[in-house]
């Protein structure tokens, strides 16, 4: 109604974060600081390689892929998206954006479409179930090592049209639900 939009991404980092709850709060503590690199050039638990800029300290950045995204057209929101999923977040968000804006898919189809992921190291292209055999064969012929994987992201999204606001819950998350206005 007012043209406002928010995209939010949160994390515990590892499953159950640090593995303890702050006394008297019920809040499970995360371990997002693990995303700083302990040693430049060495891979972290997720296979991401950090450098000097990712060492802990003032004005340094952790190796985080959080990408809460609001896409604007003429200064107005047309798509709000984001996802959990560690290093797979950026490719998941990009694929939803490309599906909606370039392929003109309805937001629910864009969110539900199978996804692939490549993150520099390892040299695998991780593919979710649902890609047709021709696509996978074409990737293989181009030299890509195809590695089947289970879904690892959940890109809940909102499309804003001239007439409506349309929510799309990603079925990769059990119990996901989108409610329109």
Regions found by a protein language model. Name each.
Residues 1-150:
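Proteins synthesized as precursors that undergo proteolytic processing into mature forms
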Residues 130-181:
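Cofactor-centric catalytic regions
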């Amino acid at each position: 109604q007012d043209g406002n939009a928010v995209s939010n991404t949160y994390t515990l980092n590892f499953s159950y974060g640090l593995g303890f709850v702050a006394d008297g709060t019920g809040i499970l503590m995360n371990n997002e600081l693990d995303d700083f690199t302990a040693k430049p050039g060495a891979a972290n638990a997720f296979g991401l390689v950090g450098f000097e800029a990712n060492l802990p300290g003032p004005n340094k950045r952790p190796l985080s892929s959080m990408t809460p995204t609001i896409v604007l057209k003429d200064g107005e929101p047309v798509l709000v998206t984001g996802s959990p999923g560690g290093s797979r977040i950026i490719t998941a968000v990009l694929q939803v954006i490309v599906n909606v804006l370039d392929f003109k898919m309805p937001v629910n189809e864009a969110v539900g479409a199978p996804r692939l992921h490549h993150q520099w190291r390892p040299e695998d292209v991780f593919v979710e179930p649902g890609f047709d055999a021709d696509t996978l064969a074409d990737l293989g012929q181009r030299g890509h090592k195809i590695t089947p994987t289970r879904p690892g992201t959940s890109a809940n999204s909102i499309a804003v049209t001239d007439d409506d606001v349309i929510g799309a819950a990603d079925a990769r998350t059990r119990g996901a639900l989108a409610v329109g206005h």
